[in-house]
UniProtKB/Swiss-Prot annotation:
GO terms for biological process: DNA-templated transcription elongation; regulation of DNA-templated transcription elongation. This is Transcription elongation factor GreA. It comes from the Bacteria. One of its GO terms (molecular function) is RNA polymerase binding.
Length: 162
């Protein structure tokens, strides 16, 4: 898959950090674990060896995944963005039409999304509904709880705390 995907600079650094850790720390550690397990004799009935090999396969798979992700990443510096229209990286404050409650979301890449921190993926229904809108606009979003309507109150572009 060669499709580029947007990611914040901080999000990209987190991916790079994880990749570096897996390559230089975890890969070495698992090799040592495998060597130690081999010393315990018959590999056909060696649970430690099998567990270490499974962990090695997982680590190698994650390394490949992270290498692919970092190669396809389109790094976007949110601090350099501005404007009234909502796009990737926007911190958007909305008012729920039904409850009058205020909620703030940040539109981020899919690998940075974390709903507990109000960071929503650019591919999510709420982000798709918000893209291109500006302050004063109303948006409708189909959620698991049904159709929700919001008014856009503020649009900001500021540094994220990942």
């Amino acid at each position: 898959m060669n499709t580029k995907f947007p990611i914040t600079a901080k999000g990209f650094k987190k991916l790079e950090h994880e990749l570096k850790h897996l390559k230089h720390v975890e890969r070495k550690k698992i090799s040592e674990d495998i060597a130690e397990a081999r010393e315990h004799g018959d590999l056909s009935e060696n649970a430690e060896y099998e567990a270490a090999r499974e962990k090695q396969a997982f680590i190698e798979g994650r390394i490949k995944e992270l290498e692919d992700m970092t190669a396809r990443a389109e790094i976007i510096d949110i601090c350099k963005l501005s404007g009234d229209n909502i796009k990737f990286g926007a911190t958007v404050t909305l008012i729920d039409d039904d409850t009058e409650e205020e909620v703030t979301y940040v539109i981020v890449g899919e690998y940075e999304a974390d709903i507990t921190k109000k960071r929503v993926s650019i591919a999510s229904p709420i982000a798709k509904a918000l893209i291109g809108k500006s302050v004063g606009d109303f948006v409708e979003v189909i959620t698991p709880k049904g159709l929700k309507s919001y008014e856009v109150v503020t649009v900001e572009y500021k540094e994220l705390d990942l």
